């Protein structure tokens, strides 16, 4: 899955949305360790600080958990992931 960035909206919000899609689709399953900020930023072609901002927002939303010694993982709360999946489906239907 490639990264799609457009100029119309803040990059970090687009990265956050794309990470959510990767989590709910199972690309990054529940409990899985995510690649490093630097690796994700390199893959997306963005500044690591921008990627960090997107990932911090995922932490705040409860979709990821950061552990200082072992990095960042997807939440094991499958209910939270399912809620996000339903939100995405609802937004698609509204369009």
Predicted regions and their residues:
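Extreme N-terminal segment that seeds HTH/winged-HTH DNA-binding domains in transcriptional regulators
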Residues: 1-33, 39, 84-87, 91-95
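Short, flexible coil/turn micro-motifs enriched in small/turn-prone residues
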Residues: 21, 26, 57, 65-66
């Amino acid at each position: 899955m490639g990264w799609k960035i457009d100029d119309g909206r803040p990059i970090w919000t687009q990265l956050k949305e794309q990470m959510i899609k990767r989590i709910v689709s199972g690309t990054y399953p529940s409990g899985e360790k995510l690649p490093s900020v630097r690796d994700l930023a390199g893959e997306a072609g963005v500044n690591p600080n921008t990627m960090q901002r997107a990932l911090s927002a995922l932490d705040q939303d409860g979709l990821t958990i950061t552990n200082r010694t072992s990095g960042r993982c997807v939440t094991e709360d499958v209910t939270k992931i399912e809620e996000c999946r339903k939100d995405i489906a609802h937004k698609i239907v509204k369009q």
